[in-house]
A protein has these predicted regions:
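Solvent-exposed loop and edge beta-strand segments that line ligand/cofactor-binding
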Residues: 1-5, 40-52, 88-105, 144-165, ...
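Extended ligand-binding groove/face enriched in aromatic
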Residues: 1-99, 105
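Terminal, non-catalytic domain-edge segments
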Residues: 113, 173-181, 189, 193, ...
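Loop/turn-rich, solvent-exposed surfaces of beta-rich toroidal or solenoidal domains
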Residues: 199-236, 240
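Long, well-ordered core segments of solenoidal/helical folds
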Residues: 23-43, 74-90, 125-144, 178-201, ...
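Acidic, glycine-rich loop-and-beta core segments that form the ion-binding/anion-interacting portion
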Residues: 104-166, 170
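Amphipathic, well-ordered alpha-helical segments in soluble domains
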Residues: 11, 27, 31, 51-54, ...
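Well-ordered alpha-helical scaffold segments within catalytic/enzyme domains
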Residues: 7-21, 56-67, 106-120, 166-180, ...
Length: 300
């Protein structure tokens, strides 16, 4: 998945492309061969973050770069490892969820892309079952995909990991494979929720503002969303950067440091991609150079 071999394969694949370094692509292929039958059979997470769904996305990115059938075969094995019933797409001990990181949206995206690459109809059927399941989780009274990690359903805080950001990104990334009225409604709903989400709070790309901006930038690139989407996006980027810059400069000051939503509990600036400062850099690159820098949240 994202935090295992899949993440390493994806990074090497993208770096090979950006740096014109085929030796890195070869390393990615070597790593892909480690995703064998035993490794796949031992997967109990299944999701994008740690399981088969994330491995599928990373392997397909590598397959697109290499056209290596052995890489595609491993993605297919991962797809066949996923349970037929989306209600059993459970990450570890969690219940089956909506959303991208541990939920149905990420698995649906992986299956749709796998169908597109392999032509195996079963993956399309499985993805459609997943769509029906996730649509059943949408709560119109909450106007969102509820967070089911606790006993009391509550609206998600519009995040990539569990909320509208991830669902919207997943649907947009598969539009060339599956585009119907229901998908368009879901995309429109997700974009509206993200545009209405207030600035502030966490700034990271996984759970916070950077992820929301990444999603809006991707929608703008695809020509989706309302006419004022670009104005909203760039206005939010400008105000966000002012706040982040001020916070980073004063990160040693407790009061100022708390303004920056990238702080660990010990008030140390986090430096990992998903929770820390690199995610801000990644988001800005996606906005500034969309033809060169792919959305990392899609493992695309």
């Amino acid at each position: 998945g994202f935090d295992g071999l899949g993440g390493l394969i994806y990074v090497l694949t993208q770096c090979a492309k950006l740096l014109d370094a085929p030796e890195l692509r070869n390393e990615a292929v070597e790593l892909a061969m480690k995703i064998d039958g035993d490794a796949i059979a031992s997967d109990r997470m299944l999701d994008v973050i740690s399981g088969a769904a994330g491995a599928i996305l990373a392997l397909l990115a590598l397959y697109q770069a290499t056209n290596d059938k052995a890489v595609l075969d491993r993605a297919i094995w991962c797809g066949r490892h996923l349970p037929d019933d989306p209600a059993n797409w459970k990450s570890g001990n969690m219940t089956a969820l909506a959303g991208m990181s541990h939920g149905a949206a990420g698995t649906i995206l992986a299956l749709l892309k796998l169908y597109d690459a392999s032509g195996e109809q079963g993956f399309l059927i499985a993805a459609q079952k997943g769509l029906d399941f996730e649509r059943g989780l949408f709560d119109p009274t909450l106007n969102g995909w509820p967070d089911l990690r606790s006993d009391t359903a509550k609206p998600d805080p519009v995040q990539w990991c569990h909320g509208a950001v991830g669902v919207g990104l997943a649907r947009m990334a598969a539009l060339h494979i599956l585009d119907d009225a229901s998908v368009q409604v879901e995309i429109d709903t997700a974009i509206k929720l993200v545009m209405l989400a207030p600035d502030g709070g966490r700034d990271n790309i996984c759970c916070g503002h950077a992820g929301r901006l990444s999603m809006l930038a991707y929608a703008m690139r695809l020509g989706l969303g309302p006419e004022n989407l670009d104005a909203v996006l760039f206005s939010r980027v400008a105000s966000w950067l002012e706040r982040v810059e001020a916070s980073v400069k004063n990160v040693s000051d407790d009061a100022s440091g708390n303004i920056l939503g990238l702080m660990a509990r010990d008030n140390i600036l986090q430096t990992d991609l998903m929770q820390g400062l690199p995610g801000i850099g990644q988001t800005l690159l996606e906005i500034l150079a969309p033809d060169l820098i792919r959305p990392v949240l899609l493992l695309d």
